[in-house]
Amino acid sequence: MIVRVHLTPPPRGTAGGPGFVGVAIDVLRATSTLTAASANGAARIVPFAETAEALRFRDATPGALACGERDGRIVEGFDLGNSPFEYAPEVVSGRTLAFASTNGSRAMLALERCDRVLLGAFVNASAVLSTLVLPESGGGASAAIEIVCAGSLGRFSYEDAAFAGWLCRALVAQGATLDGEGAKSALAHAPGGADEVRLRVERSQHGLMLASLG
């Protein structure tokens, strides 16, 4: 396995490509929220760069919901924001989610040419790892893995780098080779344990911003 990491999103469609499995990371909090949505039965997640695109898709697609945020707040006309608590089974089960967020959507769309794109966060860390390394999980012991961190407004974010680092460390333990400075830098940010994860998330710039919004 070869693993590459982008600590901030490259342009749309330029990360990975055919033959790659992509992992989009936005710990705070698109990929954490959408993990909850998937666990609660959401049928499909469609990322959009612009909120207007998500609204048009929602209006043209029976049963779809427009979801996400701008600058941490729900968008006017959207059905849901970007908190996992909004994505209860009775709300999202069987529904298609048109999702547009400030940072997370950019990470997902950067990977759109990959054969498959996973959403990664600490809340589903074990499931992501298993999908990447175990053939029976559907990942097929991925030969090429491209990881994109959402960052914050085009800047590095500690919480995303921490999860990317955790994933790199776990993949190296399974025989993977890190390719490029991004992957090596992410590995250097791998957290030491659960307490360090919590502190990194709470003290990150994005974590402090979300806390200020209540």
Predicted regions and their residues:
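Generic secondary-structure signature for well-ordered alpha-helical cores
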Residues: A39, A43, P47, D59-G63, ...
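Long, charged alpha-helical interface segments
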Residues: D79-T96, A100-R106, A110-R116, S130, ...
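Short acidic, Gly/Ser-rich segments with clustered Asp/Glu that frequently serve as metal-coordination loops
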Residues: P10-T14, G22-L34
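Short, structured loop/turn "capping" segments at alpha-beta junctions
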Residues: G138-E146, Q174-E181
